[in-house]
Each structure stands twice: as C-alpha cells, then as structure tokens.
C-alpha cells in the first residue's frame, strides 16, 4: 500500500502588512499506513502550518507551492490537496484525513449535543438515518472511553471535563474511519494524568482503528512515549528525520540536541538549573569586566 500522505517540497508563504512571510520552506515528508510520525519544533517553526496544509485549512492569505499527495482510505488512489477543488477537499476531510485540534473547548460547538456533532460528520458524507447515526455515535463514544455513552451522547460540551472533551473530538475524527489523523498539540491544555490517557487513546487510533497519526508537538517526552518516527522543524525548514530510537540516541543536529536537553529528567532538575544560573552569572561577570 502507498504512503498515506506524501509531502513534496512544500512551501507556504503568508502575505502580511509587513511583507511576505515564509512559514514553511521546502519540507518533504511521508507517512506510511499505521505509522505515528511526530513533527516537533519550537513555536513558529512551521509544524502546525505543515499539518494544516494536509487538510487545506490555511487562510486566504497563504500561497502554497510543492505538492501534498493524500491517499484515499482504500490506499488505491491519491489527490494533490494543493490543486483539488473545494468540493473535492470537503469530501476528503473526515473520510480520508481528520484533525484533532489543540483546544477541545473551542473545537466543539456549545449549542449542540456531542452526539449531534458526531453525526454531522456522517451526514456530510452520505445519507444516514437518525437511528443509525445515533447508534454510531454511541458506539464511537464507547470505543474512545466515554462512560455511559447511551446517556452522554445527548449531553452538551460544557457537561464534559477537559479530557472527556478531547475524547469526544477524537471520536469525531474517528467516526468516518479515516486513514490519517492529524493531532495538533492534543494534550497541551490537559493535566499530566489526562495527557497520558489521551496519548494512550491516540496509540489505540493506530492499533485498533488502523489510522496513521501525525502528532504535532514541542514536548519530546510525548514523542518518546508515542512516536515511531520523528521530523524536526526549525525556522520553517525540516532539519532532521529519524526513527525515534535513533533520534534520541544519536541526534545529528545541534537544534535537535537542544530539544532533547530540554526534557526534564528526574533528579537532574535542580542541578541543571543551578548550572544554567552559574553560566549566566559568569557571562554577566565577563560582560561587566569588559565594560
């Protein structure tokens, strides 16, 4: 089976009042079926823009070049997301690729029940009866770990905790059985215990649902727990790619080494902080002496 998505020499430029800004420059990536690829980098590195391009979720001010070849869920055909029509893009969303957003509270509509919002995706891609849609919504809520789904399907977003809301958002992404799920910082707004549960659910998206996952994050600890392969972005460019074991054991780029050094290690936090403070003090003293 071919790659779920193949990004070839992607460039994204935004027109701003201060001039053109190159947010993504010459990025090439592939994701195999059933693979979890983590795209990491600091804020502003271009990782989220790269991911949103796969779903055609860029603003009108964006100008793109290159190609983003998205495979259909059968793996038998592919389309270039950058050149297809709006109708074709709409058909691909949800069915071939779906997105899990960073903030579940803003991703969910507060005036509709979660069941209605799950069924909305089904209705957008074909005729489905009210009874059938409700049954599918209950089933997917159960599969993502929402307790008492027969009752909770009629609840509104404000009646769920933050972690449960993220589970609902993941359920919405999974209901049409897409081949690829793009998760943009899916654990940032959650406490550490709930983060672990959501990461386990994303792993199940691959193991039980058969979906490939692109995980956008700056948290290298999350990468170590979940990813099969890692792509490192810095200042709009892809600077390093490797399987997760190789990247953590022998990173090639200095930027990657700095990212890995930012991961807190039990027992080393205080010593590292003291050492950094000492380095800053010596630097200030040297600067004062020169002055």
Question: Where are the language model's segments positioned?
Answer:
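A short, proline-enriched helix->beta-strand linker immediately N-terminal to the Walker B motif
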Residues: 175-179
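ABC ATPase NBD coupling module
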Residues: 75-98, 116, 124, 246-251
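Helical segment within the ABC ATPase nucleotide-binding domain
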Residues: 196-209, 221
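Short catalytic/signature loops enriched in Gly
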Residues: 3, 20, 78, 147-151, ...
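A short, surface-exposed alpha-helical micro-motif characterized by mixed small hydrophobic
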Residues: 223-225
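Conserved ABC ATPase "signature" region
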Residues: 132-151, 261
């Amino acid at each position: 089976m071919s790659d779920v998505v193949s990004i070839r020499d992607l460039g994204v430029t935004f027109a701003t009042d201060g001039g053109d800004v190159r947010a993504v420059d010459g990025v090439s990536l592939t994701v195999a079926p059933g693979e979890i690829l983590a795209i990491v980098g600091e804020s502003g590195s271009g990782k989220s823009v790269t991911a949103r391009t796969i779903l055609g979720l860029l603003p009108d001010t964006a100008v793109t070049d290159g190609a983003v070849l998205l495979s259909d869920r059968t793996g038998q055909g592919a389309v270039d997301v950058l050149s297809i029509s709006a109708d074709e893009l709409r058909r691909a969303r949800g069915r071939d690729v779906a997105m899990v957003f960073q903030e579940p509270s803003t991703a969910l509509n507060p005036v509709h029940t979660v069941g209605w919002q799950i069924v909305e995706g089904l209705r957008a891609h074909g005729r489905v009866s009210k009874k059938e849609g409700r049954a599918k919504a209950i089933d997917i809520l159960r599969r993502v770990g929402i307790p008492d789904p027969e009752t909770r399907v009629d609840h509104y977003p404000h009646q769920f905790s933050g972690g449960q809301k993220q589970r609902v958002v993941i359920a919405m992404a999974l209901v049409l059985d897409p081949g690829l799920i793009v998760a943009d910082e899916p654990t940032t707004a959650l406490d550490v215990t709930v983060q672990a549960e959501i990461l386990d659910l994303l792993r199940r998206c691959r193991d039980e649902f058969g979906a490939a996952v692109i995980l956008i994050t700056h948290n290298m600890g999350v990468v170590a727990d979940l990813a099969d392969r890692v792509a490192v972005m810095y200042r709009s460019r892809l600077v390093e790619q490797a399987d997760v074991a190789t990247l953590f054991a022998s990173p090639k780029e200095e930027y990657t080494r700095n990212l890995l050094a930012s991961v807190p290690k039990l027992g080393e936090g205080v010593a590292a902080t003291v050492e950094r403070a000492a380095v800053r003090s010596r630097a200030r003293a040297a600067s004062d002496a020169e002055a």
